[in-house]
Structures are given as structure tokens and as C-alpha cells.
Amino acid sequence: MRKRKLGTSDLDISEVGLGCMSLGTEKNKALSILDEAIELGINYLDTADLYDRGRNEEIVGDAIQNRRHDIILATKAGNRWDDGSEGWYWDPSKAYIKEAVKKSLTRLKTDYIDLYQLHGGTIEDNIDETIEAFEELKQEGVIRYYGISSIRPNVIKEYVKKSNIVSIMMQFSLFDRRPEEWLPLLEEHQISVVARGPVAKGLLTEKPLDQASESMKQNGYLSYSFEELTNARKAMEEVAPDLSMTEKSLQYLLAQPAVASVITGASKIEQLRENIQAANARRLTEEEIKALQSHTKQDIYKAHRS
């Protein structure tokens, strides 16, 4: 598995990371997927305190025992469970982040986190206070680096300007090219993109689109109608015909210099192997990249711009 540097950090992360949210709560099944991922060269595991109310972090913590130093461990904070209910609310305060990291460390059974990420964010947050919390955790040695998980332009601009983030996690795929607006700025500041949702809810895999859900057929995906999705997918299948749709989807993202890793989920080992195969496929040519772009939209985020 090829690796890339994460921003200005000294972390070399696998080009495909495992999004642990998809593992579920059946421990033995989840551990078998995690073991296989690590065995096949994935060293980047992405979790969050929100997933399964912390149970996800506990399972990941079990999986990395005796090989912690071989793993780049990323988790997230900022969503606070509402005691006595199944809901949560947003709390990016310094006090909560410093409380949350201690609980994550306990669940993960480790004394440090490689990448600690703010799990969302709004322009109304006290961003200076949030940055201060992350910087203090770095100084304390509790976290090595920090980043954000956000798609909001105004939030991204503030963190690029004010903080030492090394990465931004964003939903990014051939059917959601909105992050491309930000790639030049992030490259200039040596901030990496960690791309999630690379196959757009399965629309960019080998699964026939006629098997899509009724909701997808009626509502489409983002700005695409279902007819547009069908036409675009058919056209893209004819580009680089030696590659599967999954391979093209991941290789398109990995062709972007700002992208350090593509986060893929897997609830079965077969999915995991397919994603790793896609990461290890041949690179796309410039002509193939342009052809794929010609069949898709480059939208921008229209909200949260100021």
C-alpha cells in the first residue's frame, strides 16, 4: 500500500484509510475486518467518539493493541451526547474537547492520538478557543496533530488562516466535486484533504444503478437527478475501460495532489479487499482525468460562504 505525507506532519498514511464507522458493534466481525485491513497495508484508521456512542473507539482500541506504533490513529470530537436521550448537541468548547479527549484515550486504550479532528463546526463557534484547546493538547503530548472535518467554506477559511491544522476531511467524489474549489488554497498551505464518501453511497461502484433505492431514484444525489446519474455513470464506464468503476473513483481522488488518503468503509471483508485493490490500481492519465471530469459537475458549496 502506497503512503502519503499528511500535510506538514511527519505522519505517512496509507492512500486508503479505513472508515471505522461502518464496522458495526459485533466485535468479532469488526475485529476481523480491522485485522485484515492492517494485514493488507492500511495503517490509517478513522473513528470518532460519536460512532455507536463510543463503542466504535473501544473496538478500534482492542484491534490496535500490541501494534499501536504501526497505526496512524484518527478520531474526532465536538458532538456531545445529551444525557438521558439518544441525541447529541454541538459543543466545541475548550472544556468539552479536553474532557472528550480523555474519554477517547480510555476507550482507545492508548496514551496519544495521532490526528484529533473537530467533528464539524460553524462560523458562530468560538474558533480561537477551539484552536487553543487543540494547541494545548499538542503541547501536553496527548495528540500529535489536529485537523477538522468540515465542508463549510467559511469555517475552512478561518481554520486555514488561524490554525495549524494538517488536514481537512471532506466528502469528495466524482459525483461531489465541490471540494475542488479549495484544493489550490489547501495545496498552498500544505494542508491535506482526507476524502470521505469516495463512491457516493455506492453510485460509483460496480453495483447496477437500477438496484438503487427508491429514494435515490426519486430524489437523485446532490444536484444530480437519477437520470443524470445514470447517464454520467454510463459515460464514465467507457473511460479507462480496463479499470472498474470503484478503481476509477478512488484513482480520480488520488490524482489530486492535495489528497493524502481516501477513507472507505467496509462492513464485509470483500468490500475491504475491493477498496484496497482500487487503491493499488494503475494511475489515471491526464486525458482520462479530463474525460471523467467532462461527464460530471463541478459544483460549489453555496451556503456558509461568509
From Swiss-Prot:
**Top class in the EC scheme:** oxidoreductase
Task: Give the EC number(s) under which this enzyme is classified.
Answer: 1.-.-.-
- Keywords recorded for this protein, A-Z: NADP, Oxidoreductase
Q: Note whether Secreted occurs among the keywords.
A: no
Please name the GO terms that the record assigns under molecular function: oxidoreductase activity
The record's family statement is: Belongs to the aldo/keto reductase family. Aldo/keto reductase 2 subfamily.
Q: Spell out the protein name for this chain.
A: Uncharacterized oxidoreductase YqkF
Origin species: Bacillus subtilis (strain 168)
| Gene responsible for this protein | yqkF
